[in-house]
């Protein structure tokens, strides 16, 4: 009984400490990548914690936040007023409507598809609107950094943005983890091949900060399958 309780506690603490590490690394990367007039895109904006940092590092830039959950969207609109463009969409590879699993008890786990959850969660199905990165951003003058945190739907987001990727070559910080992306019938080889076809390299967040070697396909797949890392960075090879 005691051993089971300890194991349960470790399972809860491990992702929490990892998330703190990823948050700190994300801020460091934003400090490296963003210029005062950079354009930042927050896909899965949630409460705007990352968007806050974009405003700090790029006070003269244009910033976009995408959040499909109605009450979070309303909170973001009130929070940012005219500082950012906040949009009530989920990003995908198509424009239209979709069923969306709103995890009421833990909104950060919400997504178009129901994924595995660490506990018993209260999930409501709602209808949301979808759009694509290409449709939203193709007429912008620059796009510098895109953060994607959509609980497994990241490959769809990327496929909907091939034109803006080729035009702007933005840096990507993206979540890609076992227990989420596999519910979208996506595997790490798909993402690696996608980025490779566009002349992008993939790093761990720490690897990019420390200017380490790029991830090979085998290493990227291995980190995913062993759940050793679930946040990554991709950057154009130029």
Label every PLM stretch briefly.
Residues 1-238:
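Phosphate/nucleotide-binding beta-alpha loop and adjacent structural elements of enzyme active sites
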């Amino acid at each position: 009984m005691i051993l089971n309780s300890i194991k349960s506690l470790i399972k809860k603490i491990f992702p929490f400490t990892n998330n703190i590490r990823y948050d700190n690394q994300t801020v460091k990367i934003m400090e490296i990548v963003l210029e005062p007039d950079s354009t930042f895109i927050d896909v899965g904006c949630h409460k705007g914690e990352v968007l806050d940092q974009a405003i700090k590092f790029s006070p003269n830039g244009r910033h976009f936040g995408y959040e499909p959950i109605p009450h979070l969207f309303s909170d973001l609109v009130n929070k940012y007023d005219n500082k950012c463009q906040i949009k009530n969409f989920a990003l995908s590879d198509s424009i239209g409507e979709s069923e969306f699993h709103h995890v009421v008890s833990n909104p950060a786990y919400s997504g178009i598809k129901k994924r595995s959850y660490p506990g018993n969660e209260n999930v409501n199905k709602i209808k949301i609107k979808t759009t694509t990165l290409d449709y939203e951003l193709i007429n912008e003058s620059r796009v510098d950094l895109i953060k994607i945190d959509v609980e497994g739907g990241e490959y769809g987001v990327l496929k909907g943005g091939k034109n803006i990727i080729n035009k702007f070559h933005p840096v990507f910080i993206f979540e890609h983890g076992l227990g989420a992306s596999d519910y979208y019938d996506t595997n790490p080889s798909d993402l690696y091949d996608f980025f490779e076809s566009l002349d992008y390299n993939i790093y761990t967040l720490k690897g990019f900060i420390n200017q380490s070697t790029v991830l090979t396909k085998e290493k990227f797949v291995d980190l995913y399958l062993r759940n050793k890392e679930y946040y990554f960075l991709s950057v154009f090879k130029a």
